[in-house]
């Protein structure tokens, strides 16, 4: 494992444990037995580290979701929604980082660098056969629901309900005409 990979993996661990808001480069490098100079040989700054961590977490996240390419786009999207809702309760700090941290938000504009988001966009595009609603508008509606619902679950306002998620997805897809 390279030094850069060690830094990224330790960053993921610290984010999962303490949240990204509390990440200190000094603490990170100390735990790895590195100097801050060694850190800066691999990353320009904390923002660049966060961008690489977002990409790495995104890859891991999509690889961990039990998707079967034989399933329909709708079935795959429902599996992703369930996985997000489960993950936000098990790893709330990682999920906050992956979805709401500024480096992650910057990468949203380039889905090619964000494998998880790219997969979601492809599935939504496959579901959108309407000429009146753009793929982007449908994506925003579905993605907003999934993220909002996951936050309600994280904050213990509700519990995951697969029927509600499927019904809402069906309604969003019907409303596209």
Question: Can you say where each PLM-predicted feature lies in the sequence?
Answer:
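N-terminal intrinsically disordered/low-complexity leader segments
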Residues: 1-2, 177
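Append "Primarily bacterial transcriptional regulators
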Residues: 27-30, 39
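Amphipathic alpha-helical segments used for helix-helix packing
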Residues: 85-107, 151-159
